[in-house]
Amino acid sequence: MTDKRKDENSGKLLYCSFCGKSQHEVRKLIAGPSVYVCDECVDLCNDIIREELKDNTLSPKESSEELPTPRNIREHLDDYVIGQEHAKKVLAVAVYNHYKRLRNGDTTKDGVELGKSNILLIGPTGSGKTLLAETLARFLDVPFTMADATTLTEAGYVGEDVENIIQKLLQKCDYDPAKAERGIVYIDEIDKISRKSENPSITRDVSGEGVQQALLKLIEGTIASVPPQGGRKHPQQEFLQVDTSKILFICGGAFAGLDKVIEQRVATGTGIGFGADVRSKENEATIGDLFKQIEPEDLVKFGLIPEFIGRLPVTTTLTELDEEALVQILSQPKNALTKQYGALFDLEGAELEFREDALKAIAKKAMDRKTGARGLRSILEAVLLETMYELPSKEGVSKVVIDESVINGESEPLLIFENTETKAISAE
């Protein structure tokens, strides 16, 4: 092989045999026997070969013999999600069975057809529904996307079409249908598309029962035709075909008021008379017990249509997090918030320390706001705002200490400087 410099003395203008660009339009032109190739075409060929090798090589989690067991999945969830032990066990088994079905086909050697087990998560805001789904997808190394049920409408109406969910999933895997078919879709706020009454509606309900009807086929399994990257701008392009029967759908919602529906059915009698307004810990435990007794008929009374419930055969409930669980969430998981902020402070050369009483004060604030674990970050952000603003401008800070008084707004964080005595300094 020779480069273009050896042919320049002849005065003849040389061109790439692949793309047709001249030697003046590229950085390098490599010569072979009566053929030339430019550096741009070499890079393109390398990319093509790299992609094919990547597609033909299964990741460890894609081989059936190395499919994580339910115990493996549960242990990984334990690293990131505090509490919700029963929900984690149910999810681990359902996800394992789903991917075992994908790897071995829908039909066993005995001719038994394996059904699809989509999942319904019921639990209060901030109890970990979204985190569980995200952690599962990350552990299994599969494409993951989220959708908000409140933005969905039937096709032809203003709003987001249900098939846009598959479009988002394709975007996460560079529009590769085969990869998308191994993905997980989490649909949040599913309780918000309940119909207004238990009886079938005779009027069009485009954001309630209508969306449930539109989601039926998608969740059960259909061949969805999705426009490629260009979408409607390039109508001449062929649509991508995605088999949604291979996609795992997880739906989640708070289902506020569902406990009253269950209570009426089991007739516990906790909502009548002098005890009606009493909300003690004992009463809250009773509500938790009620959720464990959930039946499909309760979801029908709540407003989900029977056909939709049938497409979500695996149902599990998450309990409301107590103060102790919130304290653990702040410090124990691998990506705990205190560890995240600690890493940010470490980049500034300072150690961030949270005293135990500070963690309890943060948890108490989150409990008062009734936002669950979701409200923890906003509390920490507000507490650390001034310190994070001033710290890059201060020199010699080796440690920042946060205690209960800082969380309650009674004092400033304690800044410890290198080679100096410990003292409290305002972040202003």
Swiss-Prot record:
Annotated source species: Aliivibrio fischeri (strain ATCC 700601 / ES114) (Vibrio fischeri)
Is this entry keyworded Zinc? yes
The family line of this record is: Belongs to the ClpX chaperone family.
Q: What is this protein called?
A: ATP-dependent Clp protease ATP-binding subunit ClpX
Q: List, in alphabetical order, the Gene Ontology terms for molecular function in this entry.
A: ATP binding; ATP hydrolysis activity; ATP-dependent protein folding chaperone; protein dimerization activity; unfolded protein binding; zinc ion binding
Residues that, per the record, bind Zn(2+): C16, C19, C38, C41
Q: Please list the residues that bind ATP.
A: P124, T125, G126, S127, G128, K129, T130, L131
- State which gene encodes it: clpX
Q: Which PROSITE patterns match?
A: CLPX_ZB
Record flagged with keyword Electron transport: no
